[in-house]
Amino acid sequence: LALTNDKCEQLNLEMMVKENTTSHGTAFTTSIDSARGITTGISASDRSKTILDAVNKKAKPSDLVQPGHIFPLKASEGGVLSRAGHTEAGIDLAKLADLDPSAVIVEIMNEDGTMARKEDLLNFAQKHSLKIGTIADLIHYKNTNEKSVERLGKTSVETKFGKFDLIAYEDTIFNQTHLVLKKGKIEKQTSCLVRVQT
């Protein structure tokens, strides 16, 4: 169950481990079940109830018990532009559809029990008349259609090398401010020297 950081805080979900050593860094929280209205928690209907209780806008920590049979995953702020994972893709797709920013994600398995990979998934989608997209497609869409850098302000600065424009930009994905010192007018048709300081 992919959830935002805000939703994990709302539900008081702690990370499953203090130090995540998995290769993909998937941010598992402690597992959950509904506090009321289920039996063992393992049936499809019990899991569905747990998911619906967890994503409810008014959900409280007391609506859930831990551990359980649903494994919430905390998405990175910034979505697939900060971490190209299934968790973030689920949240980003829900936001693009103007839905609650949460998503149930699953792995599709082949008949032989192995995990379906891209070619298998393309065949599965065709067989069942499903649309399919990749995380790379989503990253491309977001880079093309969403603004990730915002200009905050501009001022002039006098230095021993002359007058410069000092412009502040904010990276809205990582919430970092970057400063640009610009001298003179930059023409779109001409290349200019750029130096980056870290």
Spans of features found by a protein language model:
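Catalytic domains of riboflavin
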Residues: 1-198
